């Protein structure tokens, strides 16, 4: 499935010295988001910073949203994860995409201009309504939770 999303460039370096968001491979689910800063930034251990991307998107279609997710290598190798764990971008949001970056390691981490720091994945959305009931139709699982369907 291919969807066209409106993208607004908020910083003139985007598309010039800092590439536009792009899929790294044909099989990539996420577009790499890059940091749009002027100079290297130190992120201290346990510090959280809000990093600009220099872009805004407008999804427009209420059946679509986007999520900002961490890059696995940064988290595993450097302890760099998203401060909010997942960033949800609603279809009607039009502001700059910013990345909450948390250094959960015990080492300082340097973020350089243009670094790929997160990824943007588009997802389908179902807007549900609720039907208030007194009882549910019984299922095999019932009310079991928190490990009830397996060892963990």
Curated annotation (Swiss-Prot):
Pathway(s) per entry: Pyrimidine metabolism; dUMP biosynthesis; dUMP from dCTP (dUTP route): step 2/2
Keyword tags: Hydrolase, Magnesium, Metal-binding, Nucleotide metabolism
Enzyme class: hydrolase
GO terms, molecular function: dUTP diphosphatase activity; magnesium ion binding
Matching InterPro entries: dUTPase, dUTPase-like, dUTPase-like_sf, dUTPase_trimeric
Annotated GO biological process: dUMP biosynthetic process; dUTP catabolic process
Catalytic activity as recorded in UniProt: dUTP + H2O = dUMP + diphosphate + H(+)
Record: residues binding substrate: 71-73, 84, 88-90, 98
Domain of life per record: Bacteria
EC number(s) recorded for this UniProt protein: 3.6.1.23
Cofactor(s), by name: Mg(2+)
Family assignment from sequence similarity: Belongs to the dUTPase family.
Primary role: This enzyme is involved in nucleotide metabolism: it produces dUMP, the immediate precursor of thymidine nucleotides and it decreases the intracellular concentration of dUTP so that uracil cannot be incorporated into DNA.
The protein, known as: Deoxyuridine 5'-triphosphate nucleotidohydrolase
Gene designation per UniProt: dut
């Amino acid at each position: 499935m291919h969807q066209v999303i409106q993208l607004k460039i908020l910083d003139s370096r985007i598309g010039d010295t800092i590439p536009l968001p792009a899929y790294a491979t044909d099989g990539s689910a996420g577009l790499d988001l890059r940091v749009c800063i002027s100079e290297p930034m130190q992120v201290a251990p346990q510090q959280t910073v809000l990093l600009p991307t220099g872009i805004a998107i407008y999804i427009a279609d209420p059946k679509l949203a986007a999520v900002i997710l961490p890059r696995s290598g940064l988290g595993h190798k450097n302890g760099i994860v998203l401060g909010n764990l997942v960033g949800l971008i609603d279809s009607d949001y039009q502001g700059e995409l910013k990345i909450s970056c948390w250094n959960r390691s015990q080492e300082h981490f340097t973020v350089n201009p243009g670094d790929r720091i997160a990824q943007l994945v588009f997802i389908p959305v179902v807007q549900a309504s609720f039907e208030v009931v007194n009882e549910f139709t019984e299922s095999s699982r019932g009310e079991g939770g928190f490990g009830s369907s397996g060892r963990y």
